[in-house]
Amino acid sequence: MSLSWWRAGAAKKRMDDDESLLVKQQQQQCVALIVGVTGLVGNSLAEMLPLPDTPGGPWKVYGVARRARPSWNEDQPMTYISCDVSNTGEVEAKLSPLSDVTHIFYATWTSRSTEEENCEANGKMLKNVLDAMIPNCPNLKHICLQTGRFHYVASVVDWKINGSHDTPLTEDLPRLKTNNFYYTQEDILLEEVKRKEGLTWSVHRPGTIFGFSPYSMMNLVGTLCVYAAICKQEGAVLRFPGCKGAWDGHSDCADADLIAEQQIWAALDPHAKNQAFNVSNGDLFKWKHLWKVLADQFGVECGDYEEGQQLRLQDVMKDKGPVWDKIVAENGLSNTKLEDVGKWWFSDTILWNECRLDSMNKSKEHGFLGFRNSKNCFLYWIHKVKAYNLVPSTYT
């Protein structure tokens, strides 16, 4: 893994200037609890934290997810804990004994049918974890909460109806007058950290994430790879299932490794404490350019934007289960079902709306100078999906 730590810039000087902090970190091992370890960013954190050149590292890592440990992360050096964090008793039994945890990275969520239910369910999950950890971890120093860019729009479910802030989106924008489970989570976090003197927090708000996780509900790169593989199997053109604004307008994304780097930075750098940060790659792209990249990777004809089309992958892919089963069998792929690897609702959400661009100025002003080339980032995660045998690796 190629790391692009903030250390290359101003933040290294800031941390080097604080010698007492560095000495303290060297004397005590950093111990991470990653909640949502099988998600896009959780997976990146689990790969990154145990490395010897990671700041504060090598970290000891506990990884928490609801399902049993998957085969694709078995080689990650961590203690894996299968735990449903919505179950208060299970959380208390399985997490409260982890008394050596120094940092919590919370990067999970659940979806319900209404935003009111989202607020209740996601708020309970976070509070369960914090109730189990804060009283039982004497050396707990920092909590990273990952939310997202929907902080700036009215609702994850119907944001076009309820409105949003004008762009570029900045961290100091006021909350909208609507239900949003990110607001609920932040309120719980800020209240819970008061229970322990010196406990700090940070909130991280990525937009569309490019990363790797077969279990993520928002796995855009993996979903598009599956779509392209099906087009190849059927000899079909890779049509663009989205709007003109997404095809020809400017978009951005956040590399999962970059988000993990920002969270580790915020967990260790005193200048990042008790702050909320946007996180994106720092450049812009157009989907019409990345679409050609995707087509080339799967050896299919690249479609153009079709004026007036209403192509949505949720509709197009609903009967493609047998096609996917055939692809898996013929290519000796990992045994997956289409509904597990294709998150069509999410690709439709992203590609049928113009991107709401954010600003990275606050993050840079506080010392985090990390960035990614989004085209290279897209290619990297496509290659990772292939490397884990989830889609065919070679096409001509």
Swiss-Prot record:
Active site: Y182
Binding site for NADP(+): 38-40, 66-67, 84-85, 108-109, 146, 182, 209, 216-218
UniProt GO molecular function: oxidoreductase activity, acting on the CH-CH group of donors
The protein's enzyme class: oxidoreductase
Keywords: NAD, NADP, Oxidoreductase
Any one Pfam family match given in the protein's UniProt record, by short name: PRISE
EC number: 1.3.1.122
Catalytic activity: (S)-8-oxocitronellyl enol + NADP(+) = (6E)-8-oxogeranial + NADPH + H(+); (S)-8-oxocitronellyl enol + NAD(+) = (6E)-8-oxogeranial + NADH + H(+)
CDD domains on file: 5beta-POR_like_SDR_a
Matching Gene3D superfamilies: NAD(P)-binding Rossmann-like Domain
InterPro entries linked: NAD(P)-bd_dom_sf, PRISE-like_Rossmann-fold
Domain of life assignment: Eukaryota
Chain's role: Iridoid synthase that catalyzes the first step in generation of the iridoid ring scaffold using the linear monoterpene (6E)-8-oxogeranial as substrate. Iridoids comprise a large family of distinctive bicyclic monoterpenes that possess a wide range of pharmacological activities, including anticancer, anti-inflammatory, antifungal and antibacterial activities. Catalyzes the conversion of the linear monoterpene (6E)-8-oxogeranial to (S)-8-oxocitronellyl enol, a precursor of nepetalactones, which are metabolites that are both insect-repellent and have euphoric effect in cats.
Family: Belongs to the short-chain dehydrogenases/reductases (SDR) family.
Name assigned to this protein: (S)-8-oxocitronellyl enol synthase ISY2
Organism encoding this protein: Nepeta racemosa
Source lineage: Eukaryota, Viridiplantae, Streptophyta, Embryophyta, Tracheophyta
